[in-house]
Amino acid sequence: MEEEEHFVNIDLNDDNICSICKLETDTGTLSFCHVCFELSIEGISSATLLHSKSLRGHRDCFEKYHLIANQKLSRAKASHSTYEGVKRALSQRINRIIQYAQNRDSVTPENPGRWGAKQILCHTQQAGRKLVPQSDAQVPRYAPRWTEEASMVSESDYGKSMLDCHSAEELGLGLWPGERPQNREQRDSRQRRHSGHSREELMRKNVEELRQLNEQLLLQIQNVFEELSVVVQEKDSLSSELHVRHIAIEQLFKNCAKLPWLQIGRAGVKAANNPVE
């Protein structure tokens, strides 16, 4: 009777459905878990493996499942995170904003400050990298009566002249301490791209100039469409990644009996100190 408990009912009509993401796919694209197969060759007991030989699924789904389960997987075969580049770019943008919000007098060419140093890279168990902000960086302090000071400045002649400025060059900002000339050129090109023409300017132009403006406008529309397409593809990949993670987490809780290193108590989920590798 004890042996009968180990039998699993297999539906022979679900050959085209992935057992991890539960999505239907083309016939012949599913296979058994290659990660569990490699672990079994290395000597890992079959009782501790997450997937049996009867389960079929996508190769990427099995790899992501094992990454979440924190079992051993070679770095060469581990799929990189699809949104790793997005997180890195966002961290760099936030660092630039914080750098500009700080006291600009303390950041000079002679004393560039601590922001010129290399960013600290934190390595996770999944061989990923993320940027960690400097712990000893200066934090900008804001006066409690900043609204009153702003109103006083705006009433003065100097404040009015500053409000009349529309660009960074007119304000006298120039280049940021950590900004490259290439970034400035990209920002200026975006400003020129979004600058429109008035009706009077268009009336003074001839047909050839209007034709050139029309071609430039079509090129700008094409570039914007390509940028939007890239953003939509990134959004779809993030949605797929999130869906696979949710499914994997649910199955991890269902198969917690097969994971001896996972202890579930009243206080919550606690991982043991020595995970199975």
UniProtKB/Swiss-Prot annotation:
Region (Disordered): 173-201
InterPro entries assigned to the protein according to its UniProt record, in alphabetical order: EURL_prot (IPR009704)
Entry keyword Coiled coil: yes
Any one biological process term the GO annotation gives: positive regulation of dendritic spine development
Coiled-coil region: 197-229
Keyword annotations of the record: Coiled coil, Differentiation, Neurogenesis
UniProt KW Acetylation keyword: no
General function of this protein: Plays a role in cortical progenitor cell proliferation and differentiation. May promote dendritic spine development of post-migratory cortical projection neurons by modulating the beta-catenin signaling pathway.
Family: Belongs to the EURL family.
Name the UniProt record assigns to this protein: Protein EURL homolog
Organism name: Danio rerio
